[in-house]
């Protein structure tokens, strides 16, 4: 079993849902929790909750994963700490009823659910390599089954927006990325 006592874990999507539950449980197990949050108020609530149940660190890094500039800033903040990253838990995600674009002009669901995972992982890969036996956890789902193959021509859903299809593409991309990353890092 992977002992996480005093290990540094960075979690995206930590202020609600699965990410919040993971942050609380991992802090109880002795991990130092660093997390990305868009909302400072929600971030402070999580810091308070962790400090009530654990003596480990709870450090928010404010940033919006729909913005590639913010993702670079988040990585820069973590990298500036000069500490190893033992676990990167890419958990942030969403599904939209209608097509929305990010500030970078990307379809929002694919940008947050996959591109953010990819970019943040690549920007933190050296910190992960510094840690002995580090882990990258990319949260996905069975939603990849909504799609048959990957539509490289319209993965940004500019021609026809189908919420479950776009979500499925993002989750399929995560699975393919995780598999390739596993092969590369062996």
Where are these regions (language model features)?
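Rossmann-fold NAD(P)H-dependent dehydrogenase/reductase core
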Residues: 1-186
């Amino acid at each position: 079993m992977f002992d996480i006592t005093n290990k540094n874990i960075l979690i995206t999507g930590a202020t609600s849902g699965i990410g919040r539950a993971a942050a609380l449980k991992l802090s109880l197990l002795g991990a130092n929790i660093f997390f990305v949050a868009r909302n400072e108020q929600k971030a402070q609530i999580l810091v308070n909750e962790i400090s009530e149940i654990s003596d480990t660190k709870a450090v928010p890094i404010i940033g919006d994963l729909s913005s590639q500039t913010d993702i670079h800033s988040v990585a820069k903040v973590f990298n500036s700490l000069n500490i190893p990253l033992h676990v990167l838990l890419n958990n942030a995600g969403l599904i939209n009823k209608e097509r929305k674009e990010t500030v970078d002009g990307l379809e929002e669901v694919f940008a947050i659910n996959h591109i953010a995972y990819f970019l943040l992982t690549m920007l933190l890969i050296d910190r992960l390599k510094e840690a002995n036996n580090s882990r990258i956890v990319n949260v996905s789902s069975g939603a990849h089954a909504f799609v048959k193959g990957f539509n490289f021509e319209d993965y940004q859903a500019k021609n026809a927006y189908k919420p479950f299809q776009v979500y499925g593409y993002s989750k399929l991309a995560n699975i393919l990325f995780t598999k390739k990353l596993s092969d590369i890092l062996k």
